[in-house]
Structures are given as C-alpha cells and as structure tokens.
Amino acid sequence: MKKILWIADFSVDEIAGGGELVDAHLLSLLDENYETEFLKASTVTTDTIKQNIDSIFIVSNFVSLSPMVRKYLQNTKYFIVEHDHKYLKTRDPSPFTDLIAPKNVVINRSFYKNAVKVFCQSTKHGEVVEKNLKIDNIISFGSTFWSQDHMNVLEDCATQASLGKTKDRVIIQSTNMVKGQRQAEAYCKDMSLGYELMSDPNYESFIKKLSEYSSLIFLPQVYETFSRLAVEARIVGCSMVGNQNISAAYEPWFKLKGKDLLEQVKKQQAAAESLFLKEVDGVDENYRNVADITVILNMYRRPDNMPMQVSAINKQTIRPKEIWTWVNAHEDNEKFDREKLDVDKIFDNNHNWKFYGRFAGALLADTEYVAIFDDDTIPGDKWFENCLETMKTHEGILGSAGIILKDNVYVKHDRCGWPTQNQEIAEVDLVGHAWFFKREWLQYLWKEKPPTWDNGEDIQFSFMAQKHGGVKTYCPPHPPTDPSLHGSVLGNELGIDSKATSNNNETSHQQFFTERDMVVQNAIKNGWKTVKGVKL
C-alpha cells in the first residue's frame, strides 16, 4: 500500500479554518486506499523526507515548513493544495491590476512549479495562481469540500429557511481583520441599514443562526481562494452584499440559491473528489522527475530563440529546479519583452559581459548541477537524462559539442557531440554550446585570471577544472537514431549566421581564432594535459 504524508501548519483539531476543513476532507478520501499520516509542517526535517523518499507528499499550508525542507521536497513526488496565496509575499493579489502581482512580490515559484500538481479551489483561484506563477501544473476543483455531517446541516437549514426568514441583515463578527467586519459595518452605516453581528464556534449552531437572516453583508479584504461562507449563505437562502474578493462568486453555479445550489454543490464536490483521487492515483504514470539542476540561458543577439529554449527545457524528461536568463546588453535584445519569458530569475545587465558573465551568475545557484546553454542551442527532451546517466560512470564537465585538439592551435581539432553524433561517451579537451557540470566545480574557473575576458571560457573552464580539481571533460552519447538525447537539435539551423561571434563583424574571424589559439597555448604552457598530449 502506498504511503501518503500530508504536511500542513495545523490540523483541523487545532484550527477549524477553511483550509484545515478542506485538508481533513481530502485526507479522509485517501484513507481508504493509502496509508496516510499527518505531519505538522514545523516538525518536518530533511531526515523526515529522506526516510520517506518513496512516499507521496501532499503539502497544504506551509508557512512553518523550513526553506531547506521545501528545497528537498523538490526531489520527491509531491502535490500542493494551495490555500491563501502563499506564492505572494503579501498573501493577497487583490491590490494589483488584474490580480497579477509585480515580480518582486512573487515567491516560492520553484516550489509550486516542481510539484506534480497544484490543486486550487475555485476556478478563479487557479487562474490567478497560473497568471502570477506562469506554470502549467494547476488543477482547479471549481469547488471546496464539506463533510457529510456539514452537508446534512446545510440541507436541514436550507429546508427551514425556505419557510421564511425572521431576521434582516447579518455581519459575521470576527477578530480576523481580513474578514472585513469593520468595512461591512461601515457600509451599513453609510447606507443607513440595520444589521446584527453574529458568531458561533459550533458549525451547526452557526449555520442555523445564519439561515434566520435574509441578507449577509460580507466584504473580505483579501482575495479569497473560495469563500465557503458565501456559498453557505446562499444555500440557506441569504441574499448577499459582497465584493470582488469572493472568488466562488465567479463560478457559473453561484447564481443558484437554496436547495438548487446545494444539489449543484454536491455534484461539483463529487467531481472534484474524483479528480483529486485520479491525480494522486496516477502520480507514478504522470510524474516527471525533478533533478537538482539550475539552468542558465544566455540572451544576446538571438532573443527570439529564447521562448523555444525555455519550451525545450520545460519538456525535459528530467526537469530542472529553476531556469535563469543571463542578458548581455545589445541593441538586438533591447526591445524584447523579458516579462513574457517563463523563467524564474533574470540577470538584466546594462553591459555585455561576454562569455564569462553567465558563469559568474552560476555561482549563485543553490543546486548540485548547473546547465548553461548558448543562445543557439535547443536540447532534445532527454538531454538532462543523458547527462545524469553519463555522470554515473564518467563524472566530469559535460557538453553537447566536444573538441579534441590535434595541435596547439584551436582550429586543428576533431569534433564530437551533435556535429558528428558519437555513439559512446567520449573524453574531450573542452565542450561548448551546452554545458552540464557540478556547481562546486565553478570554483576552479576562478582560481586564476584568464588570459582574456573576451574569448575562450570553454577552454579555460576545462583547463582550470583539470588543473585544480582533477576534473575531466566528456561528451555524452549523441546517437544518430535518437536526437532526444542530443544537447543541440537545431545547431545547424540556428548557429550558423552573422550573429555568431566567430562570424560577425564586431569580432573578425581572424581575431576570434587568434584569441582562442592564445588561450589554448596559455593552458598548455601552464600544465593542461590534452587528450592527444599536444605540446607547444
């Protein structure tokens, strides 16, 4: 029997809030076919995750879940049940135009992105999460969840309410400022409307009292992910004065009232329950591994290639934790809309740092591996899978275009990788176009100042890693029969143009290769041992 660990800040026994009620109901659905365990988020450690690495994790409210545990969870099969906009620092999208927060307000994107699925309650809730995070693993229930006991209470009170109302307007009394009691009272006073305040910690008593009123004044001050109160009020026959923060009001069935609404809610909940169980049951079929990889793309003179690159990264059979973009300043990318890129972080520079800049940015990665791509490089769907398999037997700097020097000048070399499509792993002197390496090896690149900042970062990286870390360089298999394993599938189409550094007018062809010859000779002079034993 599969094991499911449900992680949340509080259980329903501690706090009977909307999120906790949803969690309790979904957890009860899983009890029939799974071994389940509830864990308080504040008590979960990385050891907890390691000891249950083969389990399925479902994360609900996670304020008290440590960042380290969140990071570690991204190596597992986990779902998120989203409550209260924990992808925003403010926990509320309502102040922002079209409910889209500025990028500096968005948080936890990689945690949401790397979940198998993110479950949202109302349809509008799911749309808002998707627009802010720009992720494609959202599932909206179009409903929330009530226990059978609570459904029975609603049905009894709906029946009683249909016989007539005895009271006029009600405002829910709450110490929670975001529930808008003060604003609702101010509204009634401004409109010279009478009202009563009401609260009751017992659900049955609360709904019975609510059903006595003809109207609910409810003006929540944050964007509610559903608002069960609004639905309950309409089921027991209340008209409503509300605001745009009630996301349940956007559901097509919200216009119903009384028992008609209750019956529709039952159908919607049943469909949502089936959807939830189907997704959890199918996790092994639908799950794509997430590896501890940070991707760094480079934007320079081919910005229009970047959406295609991002799409290729997102289609990898083994996905990275995050995608970053390093932008070197150039007039060719000035007008490109960076906001449309589906990436996690952008280094938007006002200077052209050339080839080394992205490797400097890579030092900020907090993952085991880093993958760097030139702006003309589109990987096959299994490139990361290929690299990780290669690492098991040939740990080293990996790349999609390998170079084996035949002399002490760069132009005299043999190639492997996508240009020649090698069947087996090949040891090479350097790689380019796409790099895959352990982040810890970046330290070697910066041990010595390179002979030039204008060229040869690929040569210098392999030389420095070999000299200071004993790290070799390899080209993974690029079999002709399986381009999905290739590090570049459109190299000829995208890379041979006037914008290539080796061809363009800004750097003459002769100057480019003269600089590379100098970098090669400097490396050999200072101890670089090439595959063919090249000497000066």
Stretch-by-stretch model annotation:
Residues M1-L65, V241-A270, L277-L297, P307:
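N-terminal pre-catalytic "stem/leader" segment of glycosyltransferase-like enzymes
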Residues L39-V116, K124, N305-S311, N333-K335, ...:
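Extended catalytic core of nucleotide-activated donor transferases of GT-like folds
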Residues K113-I138, R182-Q183:
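A short, active-site helix/loop in glycosyltransferases that binds the activated sugar's phosphate group
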Residues T144-F206, R302-D304:
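Conserved catalytic-core segment of nucleotide-activated headgroup transferases in glycan assembly
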Residues N286-A291, N305-Q309, E448-L536:
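C-terminal catalytic/acceptor-binding lobe
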Residues S311-K321:
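Short, acidic, metal-binding catalytic loop of nucleotide-sugar glycosyltransferases
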Residues A362, I378-P450:
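Conserved catalytic core of nucleotide-sugar-dependent glycosyltransferases
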